[in-house]
């Protein structure tokens, strides 16, 4: 009896094993057939898709994506595959545009379907940046936020910030004359002071001011959270549900830290302004004060949430990019001293020796304007722009562009196209001929496309011009010397990230005369009274 049962059990087990093996085999065959059919479909579809580097099955171009300075590789690839190429990363399509005309055709002329942002799990969902103006998808909330910000940045009202920008520029130049090694830190402090005063009416007390340090921390967090390819959770969203204590999954802890910093950066300066703007009419000139004066208690909680997210974007969007531009300007003056001399000669001829340049002098200084424009072109602060996302399937120049594709404007490649800008690695302000129409072609690329173009362009332009013109009027930017008395000219070495800047820019700022330094000191002391 036992043997019969054993035989029966053995037979049943054998049958189940065979059935299980058969099921596994069937699943494997079906999976293989699905993969083969997908590849066949993709093979024929790719003939109408943009070209690009060879894609490996399943992972696509994941192993080919450069981790450092990706804009350089994309520009090289564009020479082989054309100005519109496609990369695939774990099933996610990425369109890289290295032609200004193509970028305008898609992101401006078809802006209704090219104005979304890619969904970033790490930065948007986990770290909390998803509701900020810079990462919002295009829609009613985005339009509301942009309307709030754009009014304070429009050309018709931007002049009211000139005194603020000029005063900060003068304090900065005096600081770096006295301590050239503080160039980056002093630039960060004084540009932040402009932005916090303009946005919230708040005057920064110094480098330890909590509103300043929190603002810097949130910018650093955003830059890290949005670093392309840095976070596996952006490609495998289910990873966001893994507990933070699991080894190797520290990103959830980092995201919580950044979310906390973001909330402080959003609400602390807003509450300060809300408590103080009514007591000081000057606060009505700031973005926050003007909104509170106009809307006041009529702001709903949802509108208030959107506003504080828009306001914190002003801080984040204007600080690191402007610092990058100033460091690039200083590097250019060190490497191309003949440009510095020519710009100083124009200032001397137009402004004279008895006063400091003003932002309102800009239209009388075409060569200085050209210097600023060439800085934007030579080292664009955001070399790959801020990615867009394609809302629906599209066709362009006979190519099929699929819904959901991440659209990356290769700003670096566009502004270093030798067919448009000969000798692109040379710093040549003369290439614009002093013509605003030629300079605008650069700024239209460097400051974004279509409905996602930077709303703070005119404000940033005023800040940069004030600093550049003041440096040129007051100082000679000169190299440091080594132990042998030889000049040390810094190389063009850039950081790698969403926002880039020159590394190790060491120099001295030598007053052109005792007279101009006295004028500077007197101006700073008068403004502080």
From Swiss-Prot:
It is a single-pass membrane protein. GO terms for molecular function: heme binding; iron ion binding; monooxygenase activity; oxidoreductase activity, acting on paired donors, with incorporation or reduction of molecular oxygen. InterPro entries: Cyt_P450, Cyt_P450_CS, Cyt_P450_E_grp-I, Cyt_P450_sf, Cytochrome_P450_fung. Heme binds at residue 454. It is an enzyme of class 1 (oxidoreductase). Coiled coil: none annotated. CDD domains: CYP64-like. It comes from the Eukaryota. The keyword Iron applies. PANTHER family: P450, PUTATIVE (EUROFUNG)-RELATED, P450, PUTATIVE (EUROFUNG)-RELATED-RELATED. Signal peptide: none annotated. It is found in: Membrane. Disulfide bonds: none annotated. Keywords: Glycoprotein, Heme, Iron, Membrane, Metal-binding, Monooxygenase, Oxidoreductase, Transmembrane, Transmembrane helix. Its main location: membrane. Cytochrome P450 monooxygenase that is able to use trans-stilbene as a substrate for oxidation. Its cofactor is heme. One of its GO terms (cellular component) is membrane. Belongs to the cytochrome P450 family. It comes from Postia placenta (strain ATCC 44394 / Madison 698-R) (Brown rot fungus). The chain crosses the membrane at residues 24-44. Glycans are attached at residues 185, 322. Pathway: Secondary metabolite biosynthesis. Its EC number is 1.-.-.-. This is Cytochrome P450 monooxygenase 45. The gene is CYP045.
């Amino acid at each position: 009896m036992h043997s019969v049962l054993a035989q029966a059990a053995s037979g049943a087990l054998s049958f189940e094993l065979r059935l299980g093996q058969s099921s596994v085999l069937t699943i494997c065959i079906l999976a293989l057939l699905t993969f083969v059919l997908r590849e066949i479909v993709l093979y024929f579809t790719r003939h109408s898709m943009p070209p690009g580097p060879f894609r490996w099955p399943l992972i696509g171009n994941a192993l080919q994506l450069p981790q450092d300075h990706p804009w350089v590789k994309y520009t090289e690839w564009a020479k082989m595959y054309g100005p519109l190429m496609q990369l695939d990363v774990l099933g996610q399509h990425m369109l890289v545009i290295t032609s200004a005309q193509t970028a305008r055709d898609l992101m401006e002329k078809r802006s209704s379907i090219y104005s979304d942002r890619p969904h970033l799990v790490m930065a948007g969902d986990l770290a909390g940046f998803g509701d900020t103006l810079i990462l919002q998808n295009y829609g009613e909330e985005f339009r509301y936020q942009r309307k709030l910000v754009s009014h304070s940045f429009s050309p018709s009202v931007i002049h009211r910030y000139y005194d603020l920008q000029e005063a900060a520029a003068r304090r900065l130049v005096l600081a770096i004359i006295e301590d050239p090694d503080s160039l980056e830190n002093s630039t960060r402090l004084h540009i932040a002071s402009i932005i916090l005063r303009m946005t919230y009416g708040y005057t920064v007390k110094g480098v330890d001011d909590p509103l300043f340090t929190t603002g810097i921390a949130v910018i650093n967090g955003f830059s890290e959270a949005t670093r392309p390819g840095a976070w596996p959770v952006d490609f495998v969203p289910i990873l966001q549900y893994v507990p933070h204590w699991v080894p190797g999954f520290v990103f959830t802890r980092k995201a919580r830290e950044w979310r906390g910093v973001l909330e402080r950066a959003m609400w602390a300066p807003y509450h300060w302004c809300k408590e103080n703007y009514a007591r000081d009419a000057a606060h009505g000139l700031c973005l926050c004060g003007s909104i509170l004066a106009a809307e006041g208690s009529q702001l709903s909680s949802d509108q208030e949430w959107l506003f504080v997210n828009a306001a914190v974007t002003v801080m984040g969007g204007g600080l690191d990019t402007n610092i990058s531009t100033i460091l690039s300007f200083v590097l250019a003056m060190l490497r191309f001293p003949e440009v510095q001399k020519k710009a100083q000669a124009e200032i001397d001829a137009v402004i004279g020796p008895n006063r400091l340049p003003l932002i309102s002098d800009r239209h009388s200084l075409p060569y200085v304007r050209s210097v600023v424009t060439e800085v934007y072109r030579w080292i664009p602060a955001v070399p790959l722009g801020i990615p867009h996302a394609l809302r629906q399937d599209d066709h362009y120049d006979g190519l099929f562009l699929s819904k959901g594709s991440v659209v990356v404007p290769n700003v670096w490649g566009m502004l270093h196209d030798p067919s448009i800008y000969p000798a692109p690695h040379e710093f040549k302000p003369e290439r614009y001929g002093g013509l605003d129409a030629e300079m605008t072609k650069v700024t239209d690329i460097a400051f974004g496309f279509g409905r996602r173009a930077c709303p703070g362009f005119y404000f940033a332009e005023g800040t940069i011009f004030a600093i550049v013109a003041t440096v040129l009027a007051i100082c000679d930017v000169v190299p440091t010397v080594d132990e042998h008395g030889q000049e040390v000219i810094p190389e063009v070495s850039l950081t790698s990230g969403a926002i880039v800047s020159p590394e190790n820019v060491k120099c001295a700022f030598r007053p052109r005369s005792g007279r101009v330094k006295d004028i500077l000191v007197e101006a700073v002391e008068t403004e502080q009274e």
